[in-house]
Swiss-Prot record:
It holds the Pfam family RdRP_3. SUPFAM superfamilies: DNA/RNA polymerases. It is an enzyme of class 2 (transferase). Residues 561-676 form the RdRp catalytic domain. The keyword Nucleotidyltransferase applies. This is Putative RNA-directed RNA polymerase. Belongs to the luteoviruses RNA polymerase family. Its EC number is 2.7.7.48. The keyword RNA-binding does not apply. It catalyses: RNA(n) + a ribonucleoside 5'-triphosphate = RNA(n+1) + diphosphate. Transmembrane segments: none annotated.
Amino acid sequence: MFFEILIGASTKAVKDFISHCYSRLKSIYYCFKRWLMEISGQFKAHDAFVNMCFGHMADIEDFEAELAEEFAEREDEVEEARSLLKLLVAQKSKTGVTEAWTDFFTKSRGGVYAPLSCEPTRQDLEVKSEKLEKLLEEQHQFEVRAAKKYIKEKGRGFINCWNDLRSRLRLVKDVKDEAKDNARAAAKIGAEMFAPVDVQDLYSFTEVKKVETGLMKEVVKERNGEEEKHLEPIMEEVRSIKDTAEARDAASTWITETIKLKNSTLNADELSLATIARYVENVGDKFKLDIASKTYLKQVASMSVPIPTNKDIKLKMVLQSPEARARRERMDVLDSVGFLEGLCTASGFESPFPILGLPEIAVTDGARLRKVSCNIRYLSQTHLGLVYKAPNASLHNALVAVERRVYTVGKGDKAIYPPRPEHDIFTDTMDYFQKSIIEEVGYCKTYPAQLLANSYSAGKRAMYHKAIASLRTIPYHQKDANVQAFLKKEKHWMTKDIAPRLICPRSKRYNIILGTRLKFNEKKIMHAIDSVFGSPTVLSGYDNFKQGRIIAKKWQKFACPVAIGVDASRFDQHVSEQALKWEHGIYNGVFGDSELALALEHQITNNIKMFVEDKMLRFKVRGHRMSGDINTSMGNKLIMCGMMHAYFKKLGVEAELCNNGDDCVIITDRANEKLFDGMYDHFLRYGFNMVTEKPVYELEQLEFCQSKPVSINGKYRMVRRPDSIGKDSTTLLSMLNQSDVKSYMSAVAQCGLVLNAGVPILESFYKCLYRSSGYKKVSEEFIKNVISYGTDERLQGRRTFQDTPITNHSRMSYWESFGVDPKIQQIVERYYDNLTVSAQLQSVKVTTPHLQSILLSIPENHSHNEY
C-alpha cells in the first residue's frame, strides 16, 4: 500500500526513495523491486512508472554495456553447448530425447542442426563435454575480469550477495535491449509527429465574387463631348468557399489548424466554444468571407477543434512521460528554479547616444562628488522578462539629457533644433480660446501659503515653511526663478535607445508665488476647457472607471466612429516662447496679479545649473517648458487643447477630444478621417512635431495613456496594458529586508486591486502579490511613495476593493482590447492563483521568469518611453 503512494509522486521523490532504500534498507529495496515486477504489465498507465524505476535502479555506465554484451554472448554459447550435450546423452540413453531436442533447438535458436534420432559414440560425448568445460572456463575467466572491472570503476561494495555479477550483467543487458526497443518506438512516434501536415492555402479553396451592396453611386461619363450622369450599384468583393467536397475538406483542415495554432488548449466548455466562434469571426472579417462560409467554418471548428487527434494525444503523452518530467526537473535544478526567486537587482544604464558637444553647455569642475544609486529592483517571478532600467547619474547621461531633451531633437550625430512657430500664430488663431477660458473660469482666489505647504509630505513641508518665512523678510526676486536640474530617476522599458529625461524645478520661494494661485485652481481651469469643448475633455482628473464611461459616451456619439491617437513628440521641448506667453495670458487674465505676472515672465528665460558626479553644468535657454514648474501639467493641457480646438474649428468637423497633456485621442466620424491627414503640417506651424497613430475602428482598440477601454460587467473602464504587470514588478525604492519587499508588494497590490476588480489576469496578479505579502498593512504615506503619479491619478483617492466577478463578457472584451483570448486568460490566472511570490532579496542580476510576456501578446517594441 505504501509503494502505491509513489505512483503519484514526483520523479525526484521516487528516485530519492530508491537511492535511500538501496544504500540503507536493502530488504525494502528488494520488496519494492518485487512489487514493481508484480504490477508490470497489469495496467498500461503504470508501465511508464515501472520503466522509470527500473531505469533508475539500473543506473548503467558505459563500461557495463560492453561487459553485458560479451557476457550474453558467452552465456548463450555455454547454454547451447550444455543443451547439445544433454541431447546427446538423452540419445545415448534413449530417454527424454524429444524434450532434450526441443530444449537444444530453443537454446541454439534454430541456428545449429542436430538429428532427432541418432546414437552418438563415446568419443562424440567426450568432445562435446570438453567443449562445454572449455566454454565454462572461459566464462569464469571473463567473470573474474568483469569483477575486477567493477571494483575498479565502482568500488568493492557494488557487487555483493544482494547484487551478484551475473544478475547485474543480465539486468544491464535487459535494460539496454529495452532502450533499443524504446529508441525504435521513439523513432516511429517521431516520424509520425514530425510528418508534414497537408494544409492548403486559403486562396486555393476559395473564390472571389463581386456582389451588390444595395447602395448606388453617381457615375459621370463623357459621350459625344457631353457629360452624362447615371447611377450604378456599388459592388463589393466577397470571398466564399468553392462548392466542391475537396474544397470543403481543405477548408475544414485549414480552420482547425489555424485556430489550434493560435490556442492549443481549447476544449468543449462554454468559454472555449465562444473563443472558437470569435476566432472564426475574426478570420472571416480579415479575409472578407461571406456569411455562408463563416457559418460552415464555425460549425466545423466547433466540432473539430475541441476533439484531440491521435497526434495530440501522443504529443501530450510524450510531454508528460516520466523521462520528460525528469529532464525538466534536472533543468529546473540547473536553472536554480526556486533558489533565485525573490527580489533581484538590475544596474543603471548609460545612454547610447553620442555627445554632440554643444557650445551652449558649460561644464566646470570642483563640485562636491555626488553618488546616487541607480539600481532598479524587480520580482523575478512576475516581471515577464521585460527589462526595465533607470539611467545612471553620470556626466555622459546628463550631457545627453541636456543636448537631446533641451536643445536638439535629432537622433544622429548632427544637431537638429526644434521647429519654430510662425509669427503670432498663437494670438492669431487661438485668441478666442484664451478669452473663452478666462470667461469660463471667472474669479479665482489666492490661497494662503501655509495651505500650500501643508499639502506636501513631511520632507517638502518643512522646506516650504522655511521658504514662507524667507519671503516675509526678503521679497521675491528674479534669482528665485533660477532652475537646478537633475536626471529623472524613472523606469525605462529598454526596447529602444533612450535619452534620459530631466526634472527642472525652481526654488520653493518661486513655487509659493505660483502655487498659491495656480495649484488649488487647476481643476477649475480644467473644467473651463471642458465647457469650451462642450464635453469632458481633460480626463486626468477622473479615475479609470469614469474615464472609461466618458470615452465610451464620446464613441457612441458617432454612427461610424474612428479614433486617431495623437502624441506630441517631447512636448516640453517644443513649448516655445510664444506658446508660454499665450498660456501665461490665461493666468494673468484670470488673476490680474502683478506678482504672478512677474513670476510667469521669469519662465521665458531659464538659467539652469545641474550637478552630476563632481561636475557642474550651466546652460541657458529661452522658451521651453521646465518640467518642475507647478504649471507644467496644466499649461501643457491648455496649449494642446487650444491648438486642437482651433484645428477642429479650421476643419469644420464635429469631433471629440480626450486629452491628458501631450497625449490625445481624437474621436470623430469615419467620413472625416481623411480631413486629419494634414495634421503633422498643421501643428508644425505651431512649432510641434505631432505624431499620429494608426486609426482604430473598435472602441476596445482605442489606447489612451497606455490603457484601453474594457467592458467590465457591462460598464467600460480604462484598463492598463498587460505589460503593466512587468512595470509594477519593478521598483526604484531601496529594499533592505524581506519586510520592505512585502510592504512594497502590499502597496502595489492594494492599489492594483482597486483599479482592476473584475479585470481578467490583472486581478489575479494583484491578488497574488497581496497574498504573498501576507496581507500586510501599510500606511497611506507609504502607498503614495510606492505608486507612480499616473496610478495615483487613476485612483483619484479610491482605496476600497469591490469584489467583482469576472464574466465571459468581460473576458471577450479584454480579448478585443489586448489580444489575449479567454482560455489563455484562465491559464495565466491559474498560474497566479497558485503562485507565491518570494520576498527573498537576491544578489543576482537577471533571471528568466516562468511566465513570459509573449503569452500576454506583449510586442517587444510596444513602449511609450521616448528615446
